[in-house]
From Swiss-Prot:
HAMAP family: SecB. One of its GO terms (molecular function) is unfolded protein binding. It is found in: Cytoplasm. Gene3D superfamilies: SecB-like. This is Protein-export protein SecB. InterPro entries: SecB, SecB-like_sf. It comes from Rickettsia peacockii (strain Rustic). Transmembrane segments: none annotated. Belongs to the SecB family. It holds the Pfam family SecB. Its main location: cytoplasm. One of its GO terms (biological process) is protein transport. Coiled coil: none annotated.
Length: 152
């Protein structure tokens, strides 16, 4: 039988997820019911994603917010538009502050993204459409792209 040394765990670097929540959720189905009858072809999906990081008042506590917007269109209609702000509160424990930007921009969003993805899929399905299954996102590539653009 193994035991866990909690004193060692308190000093080990780690990320604690203190909360996850929907900050804002909006779904528009502007052309219903006509748009629901026109689902014989796959719609064009325009997707945008943004990440906002807020340093909270307590030391090493941060809110990481995913802003996801998806607009589905076909030849005739704007089928739906969904906007989701989904956030988590993270505590970076015993982690060097130089590592905070990459952890907050890559690892924390990757932890909460599956939950945001599920919310979007459920909402679009509840609106009468096929669930919108957003492909996995490489937050590391997004971070490196943003950093290279910032340096130029």
């Amino acid at each position: 039988m193994s035991t866990i040394n909690t004193d060692t765990n308190k000093t080990m670097p780690h990320i604690s997820v203190n909360a996850q929540y929907i900050k804002d959720l909006s779904l528009e189905n502007p052309s219903a019911p006509s748009s629901l009858a026109a689902l014989d072809q796959r719609p064009q999906i325009d997707l945008s994603l943004d990440i906002n990081i807020t340093n909270l008042s307590e030391e090493n506590f941060y809110e990481v917010e995913l802003n996801i917007e998806a607009i589905a269109r076909n030849e005739k209609y704007k089928l739906f538009q969904i906007e989701l702000k989904y956030a988590g509160v993270f505590n970076l424990i015993n982690i060097d502050s130089e590592q905070h930007p990459v952890l907050l921009s890559v690892h924390c969003p990757a932890m909460i993204f599956p939950f945001a993805r599920k919310i979007i899929a459920s909402c679009t399905q509840d609106a009468g459409f096929q669930p919108l299954m957003i492909d996995p996102i490489d937050f590391g590539a997004l971070y490196h792209k943003k950093m290279s653009e910032h340096q130029n």
